[in-house]
Amino acid sequence: EEALAHRVEMVRLAVRENPHFQLSLHEAKKDCHSYTYKTLQEFHALYPENEYFFILGADSLFSIEQWKYFKEIFPSCTILAAMRDDKDSFDMQRQIQYLETNYQAKIELLQAPLLEISSTTIRNRAAQKRSIRYMVPDSVADYIQKLQLYTKREEERS
């Protein structure tokens, strides 16, 4: 699938200069729906010596109990929760404490500049030929621009 190939290449470009990240095609090779807990189990079986971190938007901590087999995620990794908005940090700390107490979750809140970035925003800006600089690594922005990815999306809607 062409779209998958582009996503894989953009991730490869984004992580290539950071030795702490590694591109895995594990889920991309599957023909079925993939659940986080299952992927973590499979990684632990393949690479038991590794320590795993799962990065998600901190707002997901409020809905994670609705995820399929969510309890299986907590013992498998440390969750790194990135703040995506200015949600009350008191509520966030209370939710983290709740998950740690009730599910023995290991959760760290990532302190980073608050940037309103979403894949939808990036695709829409690229489709409108607007800058996506600082939203994605330069190598990814160059790739999107060079191949004119997402520009057809607007034409298809018209």
Each language-model region and where it sits:
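Nucleotidyltransferase catalytic core that binds NTPs
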Residues: E1-S158
